[in-house]
């Protein structure tokens, strides 16, 4: 996961300068640049998505509200198959609970460099914080029980690492199994990073973000049975953010569908 983060970040870092110079921007400027955007996140401990609304404070600063959700992976999770039998499914031995998070935050964004021309890059930094909830549910496994020398019975049970070695596991049970046993742990988090906004359109947002998140929960999140679990989690992230700039004079461009519209070429005569 860390290798993928490094490759993703370095690729974005190398690609963005290509857009640093371009044509003079003749598009109509939007003075009150309030923004709405979505993001896909790749974290060092999982992946997720977020929705953000940013309100203009002044020429260089914005205040934003954000909702984010994603999964939480333990660094010792490894996918494997039964070492002795050919089974169709895989599992992560030692994992007793699957965990996801839900966060809500208030933050601030400051613009360091504005776009000089069409195709330029605006550089900003941001920070935020707020409450976070970790939801976890037990993981059920399909476990092999011998009936005779050549026959086995499969039962869906929670993992007991003392009674169930890896060669007793057929595969993981369906994800919905154990959903009614979900538990929640509250906490707080802070987040910070940099934003490179490179859209060529005044009313559309395309950006790469990178930074860190530090989360603290009231108790450890019990993900693995055989490895220490933690209540304080530090993760790095990179994300792709896309959205629209709110234009009060042209409401039609405030919809997310505007991002996917393509300008029709005007034939030359």
Regions found by a protein language model. Give the residues of each.
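Membrane-embedded beta-strand positions of outer-membrane beta-barrel proteins
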Residues: 38-40, 51, 65-69, 104-106, ...
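Bacterial Sec-dependent N-terminal signal peptides
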Residues: 1-25, 234, 238-240, 268-269
